[in-house]
Amino acid sequence: NRSTVNGRIPVQVAGLTGYVNSGQVAAINSRTTFIPDYVSDGKYVYHRYSAYSSVMVAYHNPNMQVGKPYYSADGINFGTFKLDHPFQFSNLKSRSNYTAADINRLYSLMGANNGKLAGKGATFKAAEQKYGVNALYLVAHSALESAWGKSQIAKDKNNFFGIAAYDSTPYTSATKFDNVDSGILGAARWIDRNYLSNTGYPARGAYLGNKASGMNVNYATAPYWGESIASIMFSANEKLGRKDR
C-alpha cells in the first residue's frame, strides 16, 4: 500500500501495523529477492534475519518450493497459504510432557553442561507444578535470555529470564536472585502473575506471540523475541523426541 497519511507510509513488522516517514522507505521491485525472508529446506522452514542468522520456525509447508524465498509481514500469512508455528502461539499455561531427566539431557545435547542451569530439570518441573507454567517454555526462555545459563547476568545475579534487564542498563538494572533455584522459581511466579494469568497490563495473551499479541508485545522490544523462544522450543522438541507435539 503506497498511500501516505500526513507524509507517512503504513508498514507491518512482526504482526504490528504502524507508520514511518515516507523519506525513510525505499521501494523494492517485487521481483527482487532480499533478506529477511522465509525459506524451506524440505524438512523445516527457517526465518532468515540476515545472511548469517536464521531460526527454525516450522515444519516444511507443501505450498513452499525448497530453497525459494518467501515473504510475510507477520510470519503466518503468505498470500496463498499460512504457516503453522508449533510453539509461538501455544498456551504457556500448560504442562510439558518432558521430564526433569529429559530437560537435563537437553543441556547436554546443547553443549551447555557448564552453564548454571545444567542439572536443574527438577526445578523447572517444580516451577511448572507450582505455577502452571510450561517447563519447556521456561527452559527455552531462559536459554534465549541467559545463553543457556552462561551470560554474565546469569552468573552474577541468577537472573535467567531478563527480568528488569532494560535495554539501556541491562546489567545494572537486572533483578538479582539469591540462587539458581530461586532464579527459576521466582521468575516463573513473576511471569505467571504479570503475563500469563494476569488480565490487564502488561499481559496480552498467555502465549509468546509477536508484536501484535502475546508476551512479545510488552515483555521485549525485539520484534522476533517470541519467535526466537518458540524456535528453541521447536528445536528442543525435535531433539528430545517430539513429546510435546
Which role fits each region the language model picked out?
Residues 4, 8-15, 21-137, 148-245:
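Catalytic cores of secreted/periplasmic lytic hydrolases that degrade extracellular macromolecules
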Residues 145:
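Pyridoxal 5′-phosphate
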